[in-house]
Amino acid sequence: MKLPIYLDYSATTPVDPRVAEKMMQCLTLDGTFGNPASRSHRFGWQAEEAVDIARNQIAELVGADPREIVFTSGATEADNLAIKGAANFYQKKGKHIITSKTEHKAVLDTCRQLEREGFDVTYLAPQRNGIIDLVELEAAMREDTILVSIMHVNNEIGVVQDIAAIGEMCRSRGIVFHVDATQSVGKLPIDLSQLKVDLMSFSGHKIYGPKGIGALYVRRKPRIRLEAQMHGGGHERGMRSGTLPVHQIVGMGEAYRIAKEEMTAEMDRLSMLRDRLWNGINDIEEVYLNGDIEQGVPNILNVSFNYVEGESLIMALKDLAVSSGSACTSASLEPSYVLRALGMNDELAHSSIRFSLGRFTTEEEIDYTIELVRKSIGRLRDLSPLWEMFKQGVDISSIEWAHH
């Protein structure tokens, strides 16, 4: 077993060797290196064919028509294109958007930008387990609501939203429904031929494909219109200009093909490993599971260890690559905004660790993790005056600390 152990698969995944091999065939002179928009020679045709195959592989995993897949530079761009594109196109119908407080920053900050441009955004607070209350969502819908954006799976706590039910609510009112599926694609079955979802964002690098590539699903029936955000040569049916990066697209396609083949067995395996990890640490005193194990994906476990500082815990666990909060915001010492939105106090939010498992995680690594976490928590609490006070029955929240 090699140290450190990678348990941060929700931040990014290593590229699967089968994916890397396919990508290598699209880079050099003897490979498929052409520009797919070059219609006048074989190099262009071959590149276009490689892109078509990948587009089909992605569409097949999610039950879409390949013509509904628009390539972007990643899920962040897909979220921006979906939300800004739909808001700008449909603004004559209304300027009200609904999202939730636990969305990824790519959705939240896009909505903030639209607020600066005169749109009105409602940010729903989820229930304590992270699930959106559908009654509250329905109550927030107005005559001028044009767009609802709710993620499928949360990147920090792994809870799954009922996008089928939300889709029905939106469709019956003629509201465009966008779903960020970055963390769910390849982990949960998605069938866009059945779901009433209009726009869906995908990433390559969360599913053993390369970084720098993503896609946006844009429904054809009923047809959803977007205002382009990237202008140029009119690629991707005018929705996203820019020369298509064939090697990245081929890599993403192969990653989605593998996911379709292996998803069911792999999720059973990860479910077992996640349960093994949770069962190995849940008897430690003052340990809390964040989210909802029943309504969660099998690869994410977010746990708070009360009376232990999250940063010191991460230092103690230096043989484990884990995160507190998401990678996109973890450089700041602010506690996770997702956990705060669940109504958690700052101290408990600060002591949270996200373990995310993946394709190359082994049982041996999980057992090592359990042992290391148990030892580290014990050691850090031995050093903690707060833990000592808690053990003596002092109500820490009632203490007034002196400020120097």
From Swiss-Prot:
Reaction equations catalysed: (sulfur carrier)-H + L-cysteine = (sulfur carrier)-SH + L-alanine
Positions with a binding annotation for pyridoxal 5'-phosphate: 75-76, 155, 183, 203-205, 243
Enzyme Commission number(s) of this protein: 2.8.1.7
Cellular component per GO, a single term: L-cysteine desulfurase complex
Pfam families found in the cross-reference section: Aminotran_5
Location of the active site: 328 (cysteine persulfide intermediate)
Named cofactor requirement(s): pyridoxal 5'-phosphate
Disulfide cysteine pairs (residue numbers): none
Annotated localization: Cytoplasm
Molecular function (Gene Ontology), one example: cysteine desulfurase activity
BP GO terms, sorted: [2Fe-2S] cluster assembly
Statement: the UniProt record of this protein carries the keyword Transferase: yes
Keywords for this protein: 2Fe-2S, Cytoplasm, Iron, Iron-sulfur, Metal-binding, Pyridoxal phosphate, Transferase
Function: Master enzyme that delivers sulfur to a number of partners involved in Fe-S cluster assembly, tRNA modification or cofactor biosynthesis. Catalyzes the removal of elemental sulfur atoms from cysteine to produce alanine. Functions as a sulfur delivery protein for Fe-S cluster synthesis onto IscU, an Fe-S scaffold assembly protein, as well as other S acceptor proteins.
Assembly with partners or alone: Homodimer. Forms a heterotetramer with IscU, interacts with other sulfur acceptors.
Protein name: Cysteine desulfurase IscS
Lineage of the species this protein comes from: Bacteria, Pseudomonadati, Pseudomonadota, Gammaproteobacteria, Enterobacterales
